Amino acid sequence: MQLRHQLRDQINSGLVGIVSEGTDETVDMALALTAQADHDRLRLLPIAGAGASQSAEDVMLTRGIDFGIVQIDVLDEIKRNPPFPGVENYLQYITHLYDRQVQILAGPDIQSIDELRGKNVNFGLRDSGTYTTATTIFKALGVEPDVTNLPHPLALDKLRRGEISALVYVATKPSRLFQDIRPDENLHFLPITGSLPTNYTPITITSNDYPEQVSNDAPVKTVQVGTVLVAYNWPTNSERYQRVNHFVQAFFEHIKDIQASHPKWHQFDITSLVSGWTRFSPAEQWLKKAGLTPEESKTTVVDLDTKQREGLFKDFAQREALFREFAAYQKEHRPTIVAYDNH
């Protein structure tokens, strides 16, 4: 019995839960970190969240969740409309992570965001990161559509059938959601221009991202929003504090290995600040000990040569292809569900 308890404690001492709207990014982080930090007995448990705001609340209130991946604009919204007073004292950040791109896919009869006034546009589920971003951007541009709140795959089906005019999806590109769109469907991305809050920075969608929807000579202007790794501000003498601290040390020590493991992470900056929020103390101490400051952020960027970068993207493309093949197989071989009458 004692041996079983010791084994249980040993396993759980290195297990941390991390919540995000989608598990893809947390699985990637878990694989990268675990591969580099086996000697730290560190494992990540990816948890699919119920929405961006909910993910932040889960970090503060839900048992077994130590970290969350949350968009910067969602953090701003949480501060404007906190779930309880003093939220900034409980929720702290570890580091900036990667950016998510705002992708507006429209039907053939829509050529600009202005044309979406009064039209049916899907913003995703309420309290999701996409909903928060879409609401902010459309308000800033002075465009008021008829908003629907459907899951993204269902919204894409409705867009294909012409039942809605466009959908907004905030995710790293290229997104799996758009992988199977055919050229003859005439769906295309809308450019985002105009004055927007500083959380949103310019980026382009190119034919490298979506060969079937974007031509080589006509990249689409859009914007992106950063994501942040957040944690609960545990008391320093608590077991959970030690567990979070353990993760932070391993994460920062293996940062270059983690960055090099995935295309979307190879240039995120661990030193940049998140305005209005406090960095988790062990993370702040690690950066100071390493002599890193926001002004020196470029020293934390992985320097990949052309050959390495090509290899990285090739490996990522192979993983994506395998995932699509597996998804297609599951769909084809899905068992038939028979409904039984219990009466």
Protein language model regions, located:
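An extracytoplasmic/periplasmic, membrane-proximal ligand-sensing/linker region
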Residues: M1-L7, L154, A171-E185, F189, ...
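Extracytoplasmic
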Residues: I11-L15, H39-R41, G51-Q54, T62-G64, ...
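Bilobed "Venus flytrap"/periplasmic-binding protein-like clamshell domains
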Residues: S13-A37, L42-L44, D99-D157, R161
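Second-shell loop/turn segments in exported
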Residues: V16-T23, L44-P46, A56, Y90-L91, ...
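Pocket-flanking alpha-helical
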Residues: M29-Q36, L45-G86, L156-K158, P174-I181
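Pocket-lining segment of extracytoplasmic ligand-binding domains
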Residues: I72, P82, E144-E239
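Signal peptide-directed extracytoplasmic domains
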Residues: I72-D109
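Ligand-binding clefts/hinges and TM-proximal coupling segments of bilobed small-molecule sensing domains
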Residues: R126-I137, I203-G276
